[in-house]
């Protein structure tokens, strides 16, 4: 009841939290309760990851510089995070943002990603912001008919171009992959052809793997 919430004391451990530690919002405070009532839950929880290998030795193993930023599960949490991090056009060359379903790591070695592949869209420098945002909204809003096949999305900033990619689970499921590719182009109003590369093919090829599917 409201009376109980208002009279409940603040968390006893507030003074004991280490610097930088996020307070637990489950303490029953009126503000937290109000936030939970008004929040709009997403069908899946998602985690933002950041990879900035700049300044790292080339000998560092691929994927070792990727680290999670924050996991969100409501519309409000998404916008709070998105509005407080750099957009892709502001990132250093070589950096990547990843947004993957919670518990899935944005790595080929992750068991859920291992048999999958990715659709990729390339664009000019500074042009990826809109594509990235619209891709995120389509993902967290569950706009894809084969949404269960999707692992997450990546935006990559490189010297001469920027790329946005959608990673999927099962490259052999041609029906699902073609549907995802076509719908993604529709959501972004993207007119050029895009290709789907299987992760296993990419790992075996030093010069770039051929597209398994094209839409």
From Swiss-Prot:
Effect of residue 118 to I: In allele 44. In allele rym4
Region (EIF4G-binding): 40-43, 50-86, 134-143
Effect of residue 206 to G: In alleles 40, 43 and 44. In allele rym4
InterPro entries named among the record's database cross-references: TIF_eIF4e-like, TIF_eIF_4E, TIF_eIF_4E_CS
Biological process terms in GO annotation: defense response to virus; regulation of translation; translational initiation
Chain segments carrying region Disordered: 1-35
Location of the protein in the cell: Nucleus; Cytoplasm
Reported modifications of this chain: According to the redox status, the Cys-113-Cys-151 disulfide bridge may have a role in regulating protein function by affecting its ability to bind capped mRNA.
Binding locations of mRNA: 58-63, 90, 108-109, 158-163, 203-207
Misc. comment: Displayed sequence is cv. Morex.
Name of protein: Eukaryotic translation initiation factor 4E-1
Organism: Hordeum vulgare subsp. vulgare (Domesticated barley)
Native organism taxonomy: Eukaryota, Viridiplantae, Streptophyta, Embryophyta, Tracheophyta
